[in-house]
């Protein structure tokens, strides 16, 4: 398990796994080998793939409903990256030209078979990372976390000073009693 993808517009919340083998595609979204790991960064182009029309579960069945500007969130390593859809293309299965790296952009492409039930082509939805502005709730949580950290640090320092003073007092008492 690498992380999760969340596309609220089409009700997708799925796990992401590395590799494109059938066993991976049967349980979630596949991170295609030889593409950037989905952790973001300028010059990266991560490619994720999932089934359409799988008999037991809905994966990327509604990917074609995404429109330019729609958000895609990818959560990996306790960080959530937000991407905005910039393009939708239908290509032959062997056409990988849209998956190339752009050294000035942080890109994510989602691929699935198309059209539904025929699977003669691939639908590629490309998205570019957008900067996120912290919501007021996030800012309050960050400030609260900083205060908690300051309090814990202060408590540790106070305990350490008390331990040093107690050690000196015990040693002095032992010397006086000896």
Regions flagged by a language model, labelled:
Residues 139-178:
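C-terminal single-pass membrane-anchor helix
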């Amino acid at each position: 398990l690498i992380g999760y993808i969340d596309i609220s517009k089409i009700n997708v919340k799925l796990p992401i796994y590395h590799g494109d083998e059938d066993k991976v595609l049967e349980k979630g979204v596949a991170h295609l080998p030889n593409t950037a790991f989905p952790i973001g960064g300028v010059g990266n182009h991560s490619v994720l793939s999932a089934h359409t029309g799988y008999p037991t579960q809905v994966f990327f069945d509604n990917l074609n409903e995404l429109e330019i500007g729609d958000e895609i969130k990818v959560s990996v390593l306790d960080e959530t990256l937000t991407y905005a859809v910039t393009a939708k293309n239908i290509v032959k299965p062997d056409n990988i030209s849209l998956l190339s790296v752009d050294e000035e952009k942080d890109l994510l492409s989602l691929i699935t078979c198309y059209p539904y039930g025929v699977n003669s082509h691939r639908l590629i939805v490309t998205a570019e990372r957008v900067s996120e502005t912290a919501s007021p709730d996030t800012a309050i949580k960050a400030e609260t976390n900083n205060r908690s950290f300051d309090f814990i640090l202060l408590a540790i320092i106070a305990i350490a000073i008390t331990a040093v003073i107690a050690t000196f007092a015990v040693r002095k008492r032992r010397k006086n009693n000896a």
